[in-house]
Structures are given as C-alpha cells and as structure tokens.
C-alpha cells in the first residue's frame, strides 16, 4: 500500500487515484479534493465508487463538458472488464450507471478513440485531462494485483497551470 501512495504522491500536482477492480476508491493524492468541490456529500461516503462519482447527476457529471463521450468511454471500459472476467458486481455496476440520465448528444457521432480527454469545469476554470491506467506488473501482494492507478495529465498548458494553482491553494489550506 505504501508503494501505491508513493506513486500517487509522485504524480502531484496532477490528480491520481487508486481503485479496486470494482472501481471503489482506495487512495488518492492531494490534487484530487479540489476537483470534487460541489459533489454531493452522499457520493463521498465510503466506499466511494469512482464510476458513480463521475457519472452521477449530483457527482461530477454536470461539470463534465464532454459527458456523452466520457460516459461512453466509461461504459466501454466496464464492458471490456466484464468480457474479460464476467464479474457479476461489474455487470451490476454497469446496469446501475446506465440508469443515470443520458446526456444530450451532439450532432457529431461519438467515435471510439484511444484517448478520450476529460473536459471538466473546476474552481480554476475548464480543465482538459488525459487519463492513463497503470496496474502493477509483478505484484507480490495479491491485493496489489487488484488495484489500478488512474492518473490524469494536463492536455494543454492552460490546464497544467490551473492544476498547479489548485494544488498550491489546497496544499497550503
């Protein structure tokens, strides 16, 4: 667990979090809390499910500018996991998420993309983030094999500057 926290801290001032195989939040770095401003307190009661947090109407969803694209990306990731392991808990999670109101789609079709940026409103303005997922390749501890690190990088210099500012404000608060 210390190795996970070390990687998360090393990613600061950019947001990073660790989730279990069911997308429950295990740990996060100090760059994450400022991005959760305005989220319903109910969604932040452990166990916090990151998929629910991002797609729930009282979660991050109202602030995600490309919600239709981000939602489809999240669903595709869940479908891949379900195809690989047929986990009933993941199937139930997907069904639950699909009951949330679908965002109005733009006229342009949503194309499958290797990288789907997360475009989200924040206290520092609009952020454009590119996410990566990391898993431990040779875990000695079985619990590490069930963790994934979700790290977000700025997609542009404006976002990088805003994230550094948010982090500095939060770290000194």
What is each stretch, according to the model?
Residues 1-2:
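Short, charged amphipathic alpha-helical "coupling" segments at sensory-output junctions
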Residues 108-172:
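Low-complexity, glycine/alanine/valine/leucine- and proline-rich hydrophobic stretches
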Residues 6-7, 12-103, 111, 173:
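PAS-family sensory domains
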């Amino acid at each position: 667990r210390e190795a996970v926290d070390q990687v998360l801290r090393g990613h600061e001032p950019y947001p990073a979090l660790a989730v279990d195989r069911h997308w429950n939040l295990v740990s996060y770095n100090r760059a994450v809390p400022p991005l959760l401003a305005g989220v319903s307190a109910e969604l932040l009661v452990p166990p916090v499910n990151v998929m629910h947090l991002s797609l729930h109407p009282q979660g991050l969803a109202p602030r995600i500018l490309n919600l239709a694209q981000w939602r489809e990306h999240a669903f595709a990731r869940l479908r891949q996991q379900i195809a690989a392991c047929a986990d009933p808990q993941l199937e139930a999670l997907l069904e639950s998420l699909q009951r949330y109101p679908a965002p109005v789609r733009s006229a342009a079709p949503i194309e499958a993309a290797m990288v789907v940026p997360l475009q989200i409103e924040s206290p520092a303005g609009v952020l454009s983030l590119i996410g990566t997922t990391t898993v431990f390749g040779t875990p000695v501890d079985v619990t590490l094999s069930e963790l994934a690190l979700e790290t977000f990088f700025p997609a542009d210099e404006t976002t990088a500057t805003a994230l550094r500012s948010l982090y500095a404000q939060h770290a000194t608060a």
